[in-house]
């Protein structure tokens, strides 16, 4: 308890600090109120001028906040409460503001976004879906536009020109997916005029827990079609149903793993007519079997995905929303398509990928807001260096949170939920019921239909009406069934006569793995001092209770001889449930941390490649880079053949000269006798001199301008192809690295070491291929058209080998971070030997 007391003391102290500035803002109110619309708008230019003259944003804050507050009142009829001003200051300081549902987070964001947009460097306001981004940009954008700032919107379906214009605005509203994908696309363009994003200056993330924690494990992936047949998926889908659970395979639901038993392996081998499923010849077949098993045993229709218009659409486990465009990777999505007998889409190859963790950590300043962040504060601090400040509510919270009730079976629980709904419906009290899946919401809906209770259902199948359904959930007599946190971001306003009936009543039908998600459901009631209540109905058959320790409760119920219809409520049960949730939360945090440890390795490599690619794209000194590459390739070629013997006459000179011709000196007239009579360093000098002369001849023939254009196009094309292959190779490395633990080796250390070697190999391969093409390519004169996006899709998938290593390493500064991911400087780590 001492820790909790300290936590609340610290929070109160932080809030008190901000409250001192509130007085200054409030004191300015009469003066600002007296300004005309034109004078109020002119304040924006005045602030910009004062910034140029050396004033800081912090010193402008009281006046800027007072201006936004007044503009909001004039434009939208909304005046920021004092607690909302505190929220705005917390966001300006690059922290997370925890504000209860209904406290007006969207309005809060207008304060720091206006202040930080005065720098002219852009502000991103990030929301979880297109509807909220569009709504907020329209409603809150009016305030900014009134004050002379431009507002942009980034949602699905915009063309290149619209995106570029939106990013150029002072304040840009959009979704996390669109911002992330645009960043990846920007690192795939081949001309500078194809770029849409500006620098990553300041981001305010709404529902920050959903984006930075719940979605942290899901990378954003842009992929293109891979040339792989799909027949094998159907073949596997036909044999999996013939296998018997426990006899042929074991399912570990807790870790989401399925494994074949020995009997299962031999049955699969018989059905597929192969001798050994796990030998090197059948690696791909074994992978298909594994994915087929997962598709049938772990992934359930109407829980993990739905089938809509002949397509398998993933359901977001946290919000219950359909995730259009997202696909499971590594052939799993195709395995599910085969299971559901719908058209199997071709597999894809990853072109670019990044996690939300690494995308948002690139912003110079990051802030967030949510109704529930305190339970995850350690993770926000450790991974994003973000503090959480709990903002006091404007009105006291009077919602009544009733103790959980637990039933032995799920059937008993749902019957009790229906009776509770009927009881409250009789007196006209609105009820919002939260379920964990589409399947459970439909089950409850049919039970209510049988009892003649009118109700509305909001799940992944009815997402189009989400905001409309949620907004009406507070009307008298309304019964709404919603999956998880669907409708988050839309306020539930109580209808007339509802407050005396007790306000909105929330029923949770299952505890989520995370206490935070449960708190979000409870938080739908009791907004802005409204009355309300909440209660969770649980059963021992719920996933959380079944998988994470309800044995002691089951034993107790057995001893008491309790039947299905009798609930049990006790503090011990509530404690057991909370202990199980803490256990799962810690486990999930470790998984996310583990993912990040591996992704950090890839992230450093991505930063090196993207930085060098951007340099080439923007017309950096390409000629100098080519000259360096040429020398490296010549030296590496001589070193590679020279490894056989220090004496050139003992080398395989015919192969050597063939390689030289193939890579950097086409149509040369050098003979084996010439090379055999020279010293190693003389060979390097002679080859380099001739290669440079050949390069110069080509440059003179084409002209410098065309030569630079050729070099730029070749380098970008080669880098993109090699990076794409490298991503696949890294995926394969990652997939198999866990097995190193059996050899008493640390998989992460091994991954870093091998990833670094592969990165070195890729850089060497980029240099060699770039030189090969530049020494051969003939320019074709074509009309230049505006850059159009490539035919790619955004989601996720897989496979390709890496090139062996023989080079001096990438062009990394000695003081740069080492791409192996150790966190040390290059000169102190992998560069120590060079």
Swiss-Prot record:
Residues 780-834 are annotated as: Disordered. GO terms for biological process: intracellular protein transmembrane transport; protein import; protein targeting; protein transport by the Sec complex. It catalyses: ATP + H2O + cellular proteinSide 1 = ADP + phosphate + cellular proteinSide 2. The gene is secA. It comes from the Bacteria. Zn(2+) binds at residues 818, 820, 829-830. This is Protein translocase subunit SecA. Pfam families: P-loop_SecA (PF21090), SEC-C (PF02810), SecA_DEAD (PF07517), SecA_PP_bind (PF01043), SecA_SW (PF07516). SMART domains: SecA_DEAD (SM00957), SecA_PP_bind (SM00958). It is an enzyme of class 7 (translocase). Its main location: membrane.
